[in-house]
Amino acid sequence: MATTKSFLILIVMILATTSSTFASLEEMVTVLSIDGGGIKGIIPGTILEFLGGQLQKMDNNADARLADYFDVIGGTSTGGLLTAMITTPNENNRPFAAANEIVPFYFEHGPHIFNSSTGQFFGPKYDGKYLMQVLQEKLGETRVHQALTEVAISSFDIKTNKPVIFTKSNLAKSPELDAKMYDICYSTAAAPIYFPPHYFITHTSNGDIYEFNLVDGGVATVGDPALLSLSVATRLAQEDPAFSSIKSLDYKQMLLLSLGTGTNSEFDKTYTAQEAAKWGPLRWMLAIRQMTNAASSYMADYYISTVFQARHSQNNYLRVQENALTGTTTEMDDASEANMELLVQVGETLLKKPVSKDSPETYEEALKRFAKLLSDRKKLRANKASY
């Protein structure tokens, strides 16, 4: 009798634990963050193509899209463009781009975006006209509030000297942020030196004109928007009733996938103190951006990793980054077919690499694990909604 009673207690405990696990998964806040990096957006594009394919396979649904699985998708510069591509609705209210359409977009339009050189020494390298043209063509008149999931796209206003973050959740307090997506995408991609800043207007709740004078979102987030995306997700968890059970800063209930565009971490192999001592202002301007982006990316990853580990949630955070780019693949604007093919190879090779020196798990395996969580969570939410 005692044995039977103990067995029943054990069964109840298992069922309670299982129920808690399902509830926890159902209420998990899922976040996708995509770095800036110009044409190097092909690297995260390749990673997203793999992830999107896994989700379609797991759910047996060719129409499955990334926006169906993530509560927050954030990006800066080229990552902001990718964010818009996978969250902006088409005429059928589905994302206008599937994951496997991202890389072809770069191959089709990259050579034109990075070919319209102004020919001016004092001025941006490219005029940005083709970039704006293709953004208007693809995104139409769509505004932030129409995004199919929460977005977080950063830019920087050079007139107010403040970062500007475009999110759906900010619109109630700041309706002037409900800008057209093509204006936002151009702004977040308007990297100093490469493209002209972007000026446009919206209107406040009182009907007053609101001006924007924006440049690349990397100025605000220094290339890695993961912390920004995570902060938006944290606010979402606090304000959305669907996540009412999540406690503040409960990273066990956060799932963060952060995609980099690659960097060269071996600066000592590229620059030496003796070499840099001879540089003038222009040479430093070109080098400092690369150094700053790399350093900020490492620091953001270090901070997020530390926080997730401290909360015993390290498996809920995955940073996918290639830290050993060489040659032309380090350039933000080399849109030659040969270099774009190399960037695809970088992404494909990265999938086969281990996530860390301490773990045999590859990025491919880790992404499959994330895809399973995303798929299961979506099914749990769908089942709950059907009751």
UniProtKB/Swiss-Prot annotation:
The keyword Disulfide bond does not apply. It comes from the Eukaryota. A motif (GXGXXG) lies at residues 36-41. One of its GO terms (cellular component) is vacuole. Residues 322-385 form a coiled coil. Residues 32-230 form the PNPLA domain. Its main location: other. The nitrogen atoms of the two glycine residues in the GGXR motif define the oxyanion hole, and stabilize the oxyanion that forms during the nucleophilic attack by the catalytic serine during substrate cleavage. Patatin have a dual role as a somatic storage protein and as an enzyme involved in host resistance. Transmembrane segments: none annotated. It comes from Solanum tuberosum. Tuber. The active site is at residues 77, 216. GO terms for biological process: defense response; lipid catabolic process. This is Patatin-12. Belongs to the patatin family. Residues 1-23 form the signal peptide. A motif (DGA/G) lies at residues 216-218. Keywords: Coiled coil, Glycoprotein, Hydrolase, Lipid degradation, Lipid metabolism, Plant defense, Signal, Storage protein, Vacuole. GO terms for molecular function: monoacylglycerol lipase activity; nutrient reservoir activity; phospholipase activity. Probable lipolytic acyl hydrolase (LAH), an activity which is thought to be involved in the response of tubers to pathogens. Its EC number is 3.1.1.-.
